[in-house]
Amino acid sequence: WHDRVGFDREWLGDFDLSILFDWDRAGDVIEYGDYTGRAKWERALQVPHQNIRDALISMITVQGDTEFASVEQQRHLLDTAPTDYDRYAGARIMAEEQRHGWQMAYLLMTYFGQQGRREAQKLLERNAQDGDRLLGAFNRPMPHWLDFFCYTMFVDRDGKFQLGMLSTSAFKPLAASMGPMLKEESFHLGTGSNGLRRIIKAGVIPLDMLQRYMNKWVATAHDLFGTDSSTSAHWAYVWGVKGRWDERKKLEGDIDVDKEVLNEESRGHYHDEIVKEVEKLNGSLPEGSDITLTVPHENFNRDIGNFGGKNCYTDGRLFEGSDDEYATYIQTVLPTAADEEALKEIFKQQWVEDKPLTPRQLASGIGATA
């Protein structure tokens, strides 16, 4: 797989790709759904029905697919890293995504027999560069670091929510995998938010252009939560294999669950979080700036869900003009060919504030030979 996608193993430095579990955090007792109170399942044979096993295989497969796909989307960026720190950060993120992919492959191969082994093999056969990864967002090209910073800020944050919802799963090896993955995921989110803050501080990329790239990736992340009323999310909750965001806090607070709109609920939590994160970014804007960065509404530029394919303004209102008029409007709120052309010159400048490597980061060798 490394050779096929063009990832040099030396870029990993001293990073350890070991399989990691946090069994204590996973818990021993099923926490929600029809099997509440029973012991969590530690082997696939303990899972009471084949359709639940199939759902688990599907969830693990999709998660693993996104992890390997991210590396395939991003590996070429190490050639154009704007600073030594960013080369390190990019290589570390790709190393951690690989570890997460291997973790999911390990679960499939260890617990789900021949079916699991087939799915694990396919994780390494599909390729984002060929456009055949399972989720469309993970087949999208990522030509440059402005896309990368927006991606790690917004799309990787969706990943945090997905991992969090699996962290209370009734299938104990899956739940136990999530703790270490969430710890590593926090670095990805920090890379995104710090990267965007450093872009603002450098003052080279126009803020209206930055806003267009943010709009692009926020809309993509909104879609990743799935359809608003999902039967698969409903049954995953009933079976206890995938919970709500902050499930344990909600159970402690006796907050009722609406199983018909679980995806919509988690998307709402995600949206609220990125609004707060972008408000923090606005604290770095130059004094007197006439532009404030915003988060587009959940309805904007959606491909799936109740507003999938509908023409909406960034504030969520339906666009009342023609499709041609909407195409003209979209040119003002999403990246254009002219933006891509302008970035070629911008990237020749110091377009992102420098950030020094710590001695530990330097000693790790991660990304050093890229």
Segments (PLM) and residue ranges:
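Terminal targeting/low-complexity segments that flank the catalytic cores of oxidoreductases
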Residues: W1-Y88, T110-M142, L146, F225-A370
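Alpha-helical transition-metal enzyme core signature, strongest for iron centers
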Residues: Q63-V71, I93-L108, N127-G131, T152-K160, ...
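Alpha-solenoid HEAT/Armadillo-like helical repeat scaffolds in large eukaryotic proteins
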Residues: L77, M165-L166
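Short, surface-exposed basic-aromatic patches at helix termini and helix-loop junctions that form
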Residues: M109-T110, K201
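Active-site-adjacent structural elements in folded domains
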Residues: H144-C150, F161
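Hydrophobic alpha-helical core bundles mediating ligand binding, dimerization, or RNAP-core interactions
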Residues: G159-L163, I274
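Glycine- and acidic-residue-rich phosphate-binding/metal-coordinating active-site segment common to enzymes
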Residues: S169-T220
